[in-house]
Amino acid sequence: MESRDPAQPMSPGEATQSGARPADRYGLLKHSREFLDFFWDIAKPEQETRLAATEKLLEYLRGRPKGSEMKYALKRLITGLGVGRETARPCYSLALAQLLQSFEDLPLCSILQQIQEKYDLHQVKKAMLRPALFANLFGVLALFQSGRLVKDQEALMKSVKLLQALAQYQNHLQEQPRKALVDILSEVSKATLQEILPEVLKADLNIILSSPEQLELFLLAQQKVPSKLKKLVGSVNLFSDENVPRLVNVLKMAASSVKKDRKLPAIALDLLRLALKEDKFPRFWKEVVEQGLLKMQFWPASYLCFRLLGAALPLLTKEQLHLVMQGDVIRHYGEHVCTAKLPKQFKFAPEMDDYVGTFLEGCQDDPERQLAVLVAFSSVTNQGLPVTPTFWRVVRFLSPPALQGYVAWLRAMFLQPDLDSLVDFSTNNQKKAQDSSLHMPERAVFRLRKWIIFRLVSIVDSLHLEMEEALTEQVARFCLFHSFFVTKKPTSQIPETKHPFSFPLENQAREAVSSAFFSLLQTLSTQFKQAPGQTQGGQPWTYHLVQFADLLLNHSHNVTTVTPFTAQQRQAWDRMLQTLKELEAHSAEARAAAFQHLLLLVGIHLLKSPAESCDLLGDIQTCIRKSLGEKPRRSRTKTIDPQEPPWVEVLVEILLALLAQPSHLMRQVARSVFGHICSHLTPRALQLILDVLNPETSEDENDRVVVTDDSDERRLKGAEDKSEEGEDNRSSESEEESEGEESEEEERDGDVDQGFREQLMTVLQAGKALGGEDSENEEELGDEAMMALDQSLASLFAEQKLRIQARRDEKNKLQKEKALRRDFQIRVLDLVEVLVTKQPENALVLELLEPLLSIIRRSLRSSSSKQEQDLLHKTARIFTHHLCRARRYCHDLGERAGALHAQVERLVQQAGRQPDSPTALYHFNASLYLLRVLKGNTAEGCVHETQEKQKAGTDPSHMPTGPQAASCLDLNLVTRVYSTALSSFLTKRNSPLTVPMFLSLFSRHPVLCQSLLPILVQHITGPVRPRHQACLLLQKTLSMREVRSCFEDPEWKQLMGQVLAKVTENLRVLGEAQTKAQHQQALSSLELLNVLFRTCKHEKLTLDLTVLLGVLQGQQQSLQQGAHSTGSSRLHDLYWQAMKTLGVQRPKLEKKDAKEIPSATQSPISKKRKKKGFLPETKKRKKRKSEDGTPAEDGTPAATGGSQPPSMGRKKRNRTKAKVPAQANGTPTTKSPAPGAPTRSPSTPAKSPKLQKKNQKPSQVNGAPGSPTEPAGQKQHQKALPKKGVLGKSPLSALARKKARLSLVIRSPSLLQSGAKKKAQVRKAGKP
């Protein structure tokens, strides 16, 4: 809304109402409202809102610097400093600071005086003392944040005095006034500080060392005005023996004050700088930090020590760094990292990482200090295991010399661990452990070596793009050598042999090195491109490593393998190298690069497991030779040669065997290699993959591929990042596990099988424990018999316990095998994804539909575990996104057309038999995909089948014509299949099929609508559920462009007429709904009718709507009687939407005054009913209305008692008000004919509105004589009426159409015009 210009004159009405108010009063109020809103937004918690409101306030005040708004703004902001909401006070303080900064002409002393007068500490009540204290504090802070306080000497002195006064209220403000005072004095000039210093700093050293703020003020003065401080206090040595305990107490207080803020107190860093300046850092660190704060066993003090350590790194020299990183602080930090493992515990490690990263990034030109800090943190170990993770992000800040030195240190520590140089510790739980093996040096060496090898791999993993190639090669050769080789005799040709082990490398450590090496291969071999998979020479990293391994194998006198090669295995290695040379001739082909990658990887695996990889390597070489030496493949239009070489099948088996191994690298290699050979895939090779995915085959039969359990390797790989918390809690966890097993065993023992029960009864009967009726007279069992019975029972229960354990082990074994099988199937799905992505036009893709559906169907029924969920999600993603929604598909079916038609029928039937809709949706989408394939293939391959059908007696008249005749799609068969499915969906109550399925069918294959839409039309007048579903489907289908394009104009018009006739038949019972189902039935019919109107209007179809209009008007009275039923508003809106399309406007409901309603004598019924909210008769004034029915004073005529019905309530009168106007005119209420239609006998045929206009005038419709001069609105109405029910846009203008609708309402009988007539008659009767 825009404000009125003050120069504009006011209207007479406004002048009368406003009196003597100024012309711009409204604009001033508008600005004031906007102005006041700023202060509300300033106090909101959102920072963006506060800043925006402050900026708008300043901009607003800049236009009125001398106005009253400035005074109000200052008053409002000062008031806000002491509001009850504590979160709003800093907001007002910041806004006041920015205001004072923007308007420098505002005197600070005046503002400070207003604050002190507003919040006078001497006169304020006790309940308001705390807000007043904070108001004064935030007021001073606002003056300081404006930047003007240090320049105004008078205001500065007053502020200092006020802060000193506020410092006495420590219970409320704590140390905030003193902190503010230190912050202010740190900004003032030296001359000002010399002048103020005697007033703020006492000469007593005890007071100076009593609080952090006093000490910080002392350090500030010592830094800026040392001469003045010396005159005031004298010479002071803070690090003397007497003052060290006081410094410790001050630092402890500072640590407690920032416990919630989690930051380093400024006083601690100032003391550190002072100690460095006075060359007293060793004394400060040893006595104050390590011997003082650290010994308190107070975690805030410990965190202060950690933060001080991190902040001190950039300030220390190399010698000082060595002092700090070998002390108790870093050891205590390591203990904290090891013990802080619970989710809710505070972890300082991320904060320390930030300190170290900042230090490394800031000293790029000093690699020695970088190396010293990184080595120091890597030397903090828990029984040999460093506390820093193997993957440490701060390594990326190392300069190249520091990185090279760090890698050299790691390699040296791996070969010759120096345990004495480590800052090693043990946790409390480890110290309590009685196991002596936990404290053996061999165990510490193993833990250290395992961490080092994974740290080397992580460095290459994170920095292999930035690292020098020589350094990467050093790490890779180091890992390869110590994974598979052992030094016999050092040689200069192999640098790795020059450094012997100080501790022998154990087999467990060598397995960790091997695992880390293959992880390194995954990093270096993820791609076939120049970076990162290849070196600068263009060869892959794996090729260089194979060449290095061949060099080691050739130096058998100096180096030997961990697992010695046999003659056959060495021949396989040599043949592999020969095959690599042959592949170099085909290096231009991408397939050759994939084969080379596979061959190199399996060749390296020959070093790890020679017996398993030897045969595999030979098969790969055979497949490579056949693949590269075969002739070009023939086109897909020809039949596949059954004598095709089986190299593809062999290679697929090899890839499946590689996928069975627990290696992500193998998974990537298998995926890449299969992408290059999938174009040569044969049905038998595909069947090998499907056998793995088929649940019936893979679960019931013995798998051809042995799946390897990867839990051990995963545990081995993830162990290096974990601390010793498992060992700390080992005893407690074992006790809990044993208790859990015992409880579980007891529960299982409760359900004893029948065989064990019979055996128990036999033993008891044999011991005469269960006798007959005369058992009481028998003697008790003797000791020998009792012992024999006990022994028998013990042996029986022991056997039962073994059986239970065996069943439990068998169940665990089956679950583990099932988990491994599911994991293997998830990996094999990689090959399926590659096939459907890279070869979607391959005919073999069609063979994947039912196996994938089988997996989805099984997983949806039993998707309890995470692996089942992963398998389901991956299968569904491949099926939906890569297969059914693929842009390309098979265009060469050959003789598969008949089988695909049968498969379509089978899939649709399976969809109708599924227990739920999600499963049915996948089957239905599969059938749509096959329809797309059949529709997109030419009929050349289907000629033979078509001829056979014609010979069998198929009517050629029903065969498709046009474009459909050129495809393989058998339209009659497909139509029959989907017609059956549609009928089942409409008639079956719990059908898994849904409306979106058939909408997808109609949109993708609209040619089927010619046969399926009549089924929907047939069910429009059926039972409740089929009618609702049919109407819903027709609503969506009739508006589809694809469906309309499949019908000729006469056919489409005929279909619209059929739908209109069915809907008209449904609407004959409109308004008679008694149940929810009947109400929904009426809603669906009206919705379909409106969709039909929109479709006809859009396409300009001509339909006869006379019968429909009569039906709708005939049901208007019954519809109004249920006007207030539940859910009827939607029904009325749809009804009048349809009537509006037919030219009938919805009557407006007007509220009438009580004076215009004729009064009537109240009936006894109305007198008995007491209305809620009305006065009783005894309380009403007597001079209200005469009891004998005489007219009232306002001249309104009273109706006779016989002409008025009994008085009813307001709601009843509103529901029946449509009947009253007709009675007021003196005519009986009858069913009104259509608007503009003459009253005729039932035998008279219905005429279109156009003929009615010619034969009869509009004025004669109501039986009244026509007027001499016809109004213009009626002429326009004749043009606006539908021409034989044509639903479309009229050529008239909008105004003409509006007048036409009004004239139609005027000429409509009874109900539509009764309200206007009655109102006119009442007004005429009231005139004298």
UniProtKB/Swiss-Prot annotation:
Gene3D superfamilies: Leucine-rich Repeat Variant. The keyword Transcription applies. Residues 1-22, 698-753, 1146-1292, 1306-1328 are annotated as: Disordered. A motif (Nuclear export signal 2) lies at residues 263-281. GO terms for molecular function: E-box binding; RNA binding; sequence-specific DNA binding; transcription corepressor activity. The modification Phosphoserine is found at residues 11, 775, 1159, 1163, 1186, 1207, 1232, 1241, 1248, 1267, 1290, 1303, 1308, 1310, 1314. Keywords: Acetylation, Activator, Biological rhythms, Citrullination, Cytoplasm, Isopeptide bond, Nucleus, Phosphoprotein, Repressor, Ribosome biogenesis, Transcription, Transcription regulation, Ubl conjugation. A motif (Nuclear export signal 1) lies at residues 240-258. GO terms for biological process: cellular response to glucose starvation; chromatin remodeling; circadian regulation of gene expression; intrinsic apoptotic signaling pathway by p53 class mediator; negative regulation of DNA-templated transcription; osteoblast differentiation; positive regulation of anoikis; positive regulation of transcription by RNA polymerase I. InterPro entries: ARM-like, ARM-type_fold, DNA_pol_V/MYBBP1A. One of its GO terms (cellular component) is nucleus. It is found in: Cytoplasm; Nucleus; Nucleus, Nucleolus. Residues 1166-1184, 1209-1218, 1316-1328 have a biased composition (Basic residues). There is a cross-link at residue 1148 (Glycyl lysine isopeptide (Lys-Gly) (interchain with G-Cter in SUMO2)). Residues 734-752 have a biased composition (Acidic residues). The modification Phosphothreonine is found at residues 1190, 1196, 1239, 1244, 1269. Residues 703-721, 1147-1156 have a biased composition (Basic and acidic residues). Pfam families: DNA_pol_phi. It comes from the Eukaryota. May activate or repress transcription via interactions with sequence specific DNA-binding proteins. Repression may be mediated at least in part by histone deacetylase activity (HDAC activity). Acts as a corepressor and in concert with CRY1, represses the transcription of the core circadian clock component PER2. Preferentially binds to dimethylated histone H3 'Lys-9' (H3K9me2) on the PER2 promoter. Has a role in rRNA biogenesis together with PWP1. This is Myb-binding protein 1A. It comes from Homo sapiens (Human). The gene is MYBBP1A.
